[in-house]
Amino acid sequence: MTNIRKSHPLIKIVNHSFIDLPTPSNISAWWNFGSLLGFCLVIQIVTGLFLAMHYTSDTMTAFSSVTHICRDVNYGWLIRYMHANGASMFFICLFLHIGRGLYYGSYTYFETWNVGVILLFAVMATAFMGYVLPWGQMSFWGATVITNLLSAIPYIGTVLVEWIWGGFSVDKATLTRFFAFHFVLPFIIAALAMIHLLFLHETGSNNPSGLISDSDKIPFHPYYSIKDLLGALILLLIFMNLVLFSPDLLGDPDNYTPANPLNTPPHIKPEWYFLFAYAILRSIPNKLGGVLALVFSILILMLFPILHMSKQRSMMFRPLSQCFFWILVADLFTLTWIGGQPVEYPFITIGQVASVLYFMIILIILPSISLLENKLLKW
C-alpha cells in the first residue's frame, strides 16, 4: 500500500509543497522569511478575527470599542497589541524577503516575482485600512490625507475621492467600508500567497549562488522544516518582547486621542513602514507628480527583471553591485527617517536627494554597474 501522504489527493499537494519538496542544499537563513510571512499572516488573521468580534465600525463607538477591548475583554489588550505590532513584524519580514529577492536575483522568476509585488500592494492596502479603524486622530487624518491623494487624478479625481469616502468627508460610510475591506483582504492575500507558492514550485527555489541546483537538492522536511521552525521561534521571541514590554514603541501617541475633524495634529504621518514612500511623495512639490512617484516607488519592483543586465543571476560574486545594493538600503533608511520629520529645511532637501538617488540607483546605476562587471569578466 502506498504511503497516504503520496496517494491521498489533498495530502499529496501538501506533501509536494512542504515535505518532499526538492530544495537547494545551500539556501541560507535569508530563505526563512517566506515561511515567517505565512506565520505572520496566520497571527494577523487569528487576532483580527477575535478583535472583529468586539469591534464596532461606527464613528460614534469605534474608539470606545477599542478601549473596551483593551480594558474589559479577557486578554483583549494582548490581542489588540499582537495585531498592531504583528503588522510591523509582517512588514519587517516583507522588506527582508524583497531585499533577499533583489540581492540574489530571485526576480528572474517573472510570475512569482510579479505575484509578490501584487501581494505587497495588497498588504499595504490592508495595513492602511486597518490603521484607520481605531478612529484616533492619526487614523482620521491619515485616512483624509492619503485618500485625498486620488484627487490628483485628472478629470475623475474629485468624484473618485467622494465615491471612496461615501460622502463629502471621511465619515461613518468610510469607516464601515474600510472595516469590510480590511476584513476580507487578508483572505485574498492568503489566496495570492498560494498562487505565489504555486509559481515558485513550478521553477524550484533560487539559491545564494544563483546557479542551477538541480544536481544537489535535498527534501524540505526535515532539513528546512526544522530551520523554519527555529526562525519562527526567534521571530516569536522578538515579537512577544515587543508586545509585552513596549507595545506602543512603533505606534503614534496621537492615536490615543479620539478623532476630531476640527483639530489637525501638528505632524500627520503614516505608520513607520510607509514612511519611505511618504517621503518620496512629499519630496515632489507637484501633487500629481508626488502621487505618481509614490506609486512608481513600489511599482518599480516590477521593472527589476527587465533591468537585469548582468550575466550572473546573484550578487554573490559581484562586489560592485553589492556596494550599490547596500547604498540603496541605506537610502531607504534615510527616506524612512525623513518621512517622519517635519516639512522644513534641511529635511526637504535631504528627502529630495534621497528620492532622486533611489530612482537613479535602480534605473541607471545598477544596470550600468552590471554591464561594467560583464566587461571586467570579459563576458
From Swiss-Prot:
Pfam families linked: Cytochrom_B_C (PF00032), Cytochrome_B (PF00033)
Keyword Chaperone: no
Gene Ontology biological process: mitochondrial electron transport, ubiquinol to cytochrome c
Free-text remark on how the cofactor is bound: Binds 2 heme b groups non-covalently.
A GO term for molecular function: ubiquinol-cytochrome-c reductase activity
Annotated residues for binding of heme b b566: 97, 196
Residues binding a ubiquinone: 201
Subcellular location: Mitochondrion inner membrane
Positions with a binding annotation for heme b b562: 83, 182
The keyword Ion transport is annotated on this UniProt entry: no
InterPro entries for this protein: Cyt_b/b6_C, Cyt_b/b6_C_sf, Cyt_b/b6_N, Cytb/b6-like_sf, Cytochrome_b, Cytochrome_b_C_euk/bac, Cytochrome_b_N_euk/bac, Di-haem_cyt_TM
Domain of life: Eukaryota
Cofactor: heme b
Membrane topology of this protein: Multi-pass membrane protein
Role, per record: Component of the ubiquinol-cytochrome c reductase complex (complex III or cytochrome b-c1 complex) that is part of the mitochondrial respiratory chain. The b-c1 complex mediates electron transfer from ubiquinol to cytochrome c. Contributes to the generation of a proton gradient across the mitochondrial membrane that is then used for ATP synthesis.
Stated family: Belongs to the cytochrome b family.
Other comment: Heme 1 (or BL or b562) is low-potential and absorbs at about 562 nm, and heme 2 (or BH or b566) is high-potential and absorbs at about 566 nm.
Record-given protein name: Cytochrome b
Organism of this sequence: Hylopetes phayrei
Gene name of the record: MT-CYB
